[in-house]
Amino acid sequence: MLYNGYMITVYSTNTCAYCKQVKQYLTKKGKEFSEVDLDENPAKRQELYLRTNIMIVPITEIDGQLVVGYNLGKLAKLI
């Protein structure tokens, strides 16, 4: 989703506790985001891996910049 002119996407899995925490953080900050569940979308998982060479979740993409894992400091700087 576009937020203040940029897009926020959270790539997550069903069992990832840190993914839930990142989504809660963004919601608490009033940021709209789209979510891609990689468990339900294996093609997107493969596409993301080929693009980033990263197999860790969550991955939060903000205006083309990636935040890997639960890194609230980096998220705060980008939103």
Feature annotation, model-predicted:
Residues 2-31:
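Local sequence-structure signature of Cys/Sec-based thiol-disulfide redox active-site neighborhoods
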Residues 33-44:
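Thiol-based oxidoreductase modules, predominantly thioredoxin-like and allied folds used
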Residues 44, 71-74:
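Hydrophobic alpha-helical segments typical of transmembrane helices
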Residues 50-52:
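Major-groove DNA-recognition helix of helix-turn-helix-type DNA-binding domains
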Residues 58-67:
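A short, hydrophobic beta-strand/beta-hairpin element that forms part of a small beta-sheet core
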Residues 75-79:
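Short hydrophobic/aromatic patches at helix-to-coil boundaries
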